[in-house]
Amino acid sequence: MTVQKSKNPQVDIAEDNAFFPSEYSLSQYTSPVSDLDGVDYPKPYRGKHKILVIAADERYLPTDNGKLFSTGNHPIETLLPLYHLHAAGFEFEVATISGLMTKFEYWAMPHKDEKVMPFFEQHKSLFRNPKKLADVVASLNADSEYAAIFVPGGHGALIGLPESEDVAAALQWAIENDRFVISLCHGPAAFLALRHGDNPLNGYSICAFPDAADKQTPEIGYMPGHLTWYFGEELKKMGMNIINDDITGRVHKDRKVLTGDSPFAANALGKLAAQEMLAAYAG
């Protein structure tokens, strides 16, 4: 007899009234091994340009019933794109708003993946000891070595990033200076930082995690309650077009903004980003 896994969110004892996803939702949406493939870049980039990763530094996301969702950056959404970019020759730096360590959704870590886990261990210190984003922003100019800004997904991207003036300044710099902006799933919530000023992303099309899907996840205990706001609705208000209404692993390129719809798009987004950046910088 098959025992049905529980759909009740699991208690996170590190914080009051906080919860991890249910056993059932983890069985449906996580895997001990990723779908990493196609890492084939025979002529990698050899220059000085690199990636700036803007990571999440807060773990707990309040839901509508007062319960906290224990979140952060999704490991697959973070590590697979970076694996491709690193293999293509692009090093990366990590920054958070506070300068404090990156928070990961460790419950989604592909802990048996023989390629991704060594890559994570090799670069863990960058996530544990990130730069403070304000310090990075203060140093940005037309000659800065960052070729792209990458905002990983995970619900942690909903916390702080959409209101951050430093995130807005970094994105503004990237777009004005013809750099790449890469993001997926909930990461594009960071684009909301641009809504209170000049919005250079007005009219852009992207892929992102659908609001409709976020509204369904509490039913299986992925989150302990419903979100108090939905980033897709807000992105549309600031003139952005979300081209997907489902989750298929879709990726999209609009000029130099490269996006994906979910963790299922992480590998494809990594390929797309590596190919586009190699064409731009190593062509």
Swiss-Prot record:
**Per the entry, what induces it?**
By heat shock.
Localization annotation: Cytoplasm
Instruction: Give the keywords, sorted.
Output: Cytoplasm, DNA damage, DNA repair, Hydrolase, Metal-binding, Stress response, Zinc
Q: What is its EC number?
A: 3.1.2.-, 3.5.1.-, 3.5.1.124
Does the keyword field hold DNA damage?
yes
Query: What are the positions of the active site?
Result: 185
Question: Does the keyword field hold Glycoprotein?
Answer: no
Which InterPro entries does the entry mention? Class_I_gatase-like (IPR029062), HchA (IPR017283), Prot/Nucl_acid_deglycase (IPR050325)
One example of a Gene Ontology biological process annotation:
methylglyoxal catabolic process to D-lactate via S-lactoyl-glutathione
A Gene Ontology term for the protein's cellular component: cytoplasm
What molecular functions are annotated in GO for this chain?
glyoxalase III activity; protein deglycase activity; thiolester hydrolase activity; zinc ion binding
Q: What is catalysed by this protein?
A: N(omega)-(1-hydroxy-2-oxopropyl)-L-arginyl-[protein] + H2O = lactate + L-arginyl-[protein] + H(+); N(6)-(1-hydroxy-2-oxopropyl)-L-lysyl-[protein] + H2O = lactate + L-lysyl-[protein] + H(+); S-(1-hydroxy-2-oxopropyl)-L-cysteinyl-[protein] + H2O = lactate + L-cysteinyl-[protein] + H(+); N(omega)-(1-hydroxy-2-oxoethyl)-L-arginyl-[protein] + H2O = L-arginyl-[protein] + glycolate + H(+)
**Binding-site residues for Zn(2+), renumbered to this chain:** 86, 91, 123
Q: Which residues cross the membrane?
A: none
Outline the subunit composition. Answer: Homodimer.
Q: Which PANTHER family match?
A: PROTEIN/NUCLEIC ACID DEGLYCASE DJ-1-RELATED, PROTEIN_NUCLEIC ACID DEGLYCASE 1
Q: What does this protein do?
A: Protein and nucleotide deglycase that catalyzes the deglycation of the Maillard adducts formed between amino groups of proteins or nucleotides and reactive carbonyl groups of glyoxals. Thus, functions as a protein deglycase that repairs methylglyoxal- and glyoxal-glycated proteins, and releases repaired proteins and lactate or glycolate, respectively. Deglycates cysteine, arginine and lysine residues in proteins, and thus reactivates these proteins by reversing glycation by glyoxals.
What name does UniProt use for this protein? Protein/nucleic acid deglycase HchA
